[in-house]
Amino acid sequence: MQMPDVGSLLLVVVIMLGLLPFAAMVVTSYTKIVVVLGLLRNAIGVQQVPPNMVLNGVALLVSCFVMAPVGMEAFKAAAQNYGAGSDNSRVVVLLDACREPFRQFLLKHTREREKAFFMRSAQQIWPKDKAATLKSDDLLVLAPAFTLSELTEAFRIGFLLYLVFIVIDLVVANALMAMGLSQVTPTNVAIPFKLLLFVAMDGWSMLIHGLVLSYR
């Protein structure tokens, strides 16, 4: 059995760890989830609760669950191709093997409109010889198109969340004016009612369930 080269293995680990934060933001479900959670917090009106660390932790845990099948496929591909190539090219071979599961995930969840935009943009701003070799399923196209698709979807969800809570704000503001309490800030009075509605509807479960199932 061939023993793995320690130097090559260490280099692979360092490169993977360096790319991990970037990959978590652009080729996983993390971006959409953390943006939706942030918009929810703003819509309720509690700016610091949950704190940013908690929101990011929840988004990371949910993203790990969503991306687990992709990660397992990437790990399997890397294990199968570990011995391939020379010591100098082994990192390239492993990265090439790992990218296919992520590429398939991006293909499935990227809007055609965004892919078409980046393909057209490449024709306009790239050198002609480079643009001619670019394909719509290349990571250079899929990564930005996927990120833009995720942000668009996140803001759509945030818009719907805001609509629900704005209704409560309007009702509370009108009620305070009718009682002659125009000096009272409607936002502060509305927060308990927003929290009550959110808890009564089991809002956390509904929101997280919906986000997870959006990646079916």
From Swiss-Prot:
Q: Which UniProt keywords apply?
A: Cell membrane, Membrane, Transmembrane, Transmembrane helix, Virulence
Q: Which GO terms describe its cellular component?
A: plasma membrane
Sorted alphabetically, which InterPro entries does this protein's record hold?
Answer: T3SS_IM_P, T3SS_YscR-like
GO BP term, example: protein secretion
The record, for Pfam families, names:
FliP
Family matches, as NCBIfam families:
PRK12797.1, yscR
**Stored PANTHER family:** FLAGELLAR BIOSYNTHETIC PROTEIN FLIP, SURFACE PRESENTATION OF ANTIGENS PROTEIN SPAP
Relate the protein's function as given in its record: Important for pathogenicity.
Q: What is this protein called?
A: Pathogenicity-related ORF2
Recorded source organism is Xanthomonas campestris pv. glycines
Taxonomic lineage: Bacteria, Pseudomonadati, Pseudomonadota, Gammaproteobacteria, Lysobacterales
